[in-house]
């Protein structure tokens, strides 16, 4: 590890995050995260503090991936064409709402974080937008689709996914949990490990991810790395 300052900084945060979780090697996990993010050769261990990368001159468009449609084009290509022809010079950034394959909630019940919904386009469309505009997107990290490969693996007792989701007992005292939903908080699921009750803050199609498992954190670090590589 070339940059011990970076390692120590990451380890400090990992210790705070996983203070109450037993059996975690803070140093090994920190090294894994640095490797996943490909930061091994970074010269400076600390980012410059309190640098605001946004100011009053920034103006952004927020859009679903299919808000702009043109016959014969993918929606994301049409979005780029609209930005270039209609608002370039007036705006310098675009926030695209979830553009992944999904099963419900307008894109917020994600099936596959590593893919672009093929009905919208592909990663080349995302990279094209990022070439000319500051690009922002949603990373839905609190839950994923109950039909995702991770949850299928949870049901079948396979990795990755077997221990990726928050579970609880129906005997737990949950009356203090307040949420604007009508469906029960817990969903009963038959799995290879027996009957389990998974935590569903939003809906039974959106199962909460368990970040007490460091493998979940590493999966999302890998996803973030992919997004950065794509603009």
Where are the predicted features?
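Acidic/aromatic-lined carbohydrate-recognition and catalytic surfaces
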Residues: 3-221, 225
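Active-site groove signature of glycoside hydrolases
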Residues: 227-231
């Amino acid at each position: 590890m070339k940059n011990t300052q970076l390692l120590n900084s990451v380890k400090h945060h990992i210790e705070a995050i996983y203070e109450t979780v037993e059996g975690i090697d803070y140093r090994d996990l920190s090294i894994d995260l640095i490797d996943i993010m490909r930061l091994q050769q970074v010269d400076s261990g600390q980012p410059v503090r309190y640098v605001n990368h946004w100011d009053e001159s920034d103006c952004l468009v927020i859009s679903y991936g299919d808000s702009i449609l043109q016959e014969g084009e993918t929606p994301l290509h049409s979005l780029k064409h609209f930005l270039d022809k209609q608002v370039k010079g007036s705006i310098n950034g675009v926030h695209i709402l979830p553009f992944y394959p999904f099963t419900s909630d307008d894109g917020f019940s994600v099936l596959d974080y590593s893919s672009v919904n093929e009905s919208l386009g592909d990663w080349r469309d995302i990279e094209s937008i990022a070439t000319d505009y500051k690009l922002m997107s949603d990373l839905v990290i609190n839950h994923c689709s109950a039909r995702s490969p991770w949850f299928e693996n949870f049901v079948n007792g396979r990795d990755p996914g077997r221990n990726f989701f928050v579970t609880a007992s129906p005997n737990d005292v949950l009356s203090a949990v307040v949420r604007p939903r009508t469906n029960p908080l817990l969903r009963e699921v038959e799995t290879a490990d027996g009957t389990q009750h998974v935590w569903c803050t939003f809906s039974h199609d959106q199962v909460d991810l368990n970040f007490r498992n460091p493998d979940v954190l590493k999966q999302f670090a890998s996803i973030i790395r992919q997004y950065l590589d794509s603009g």
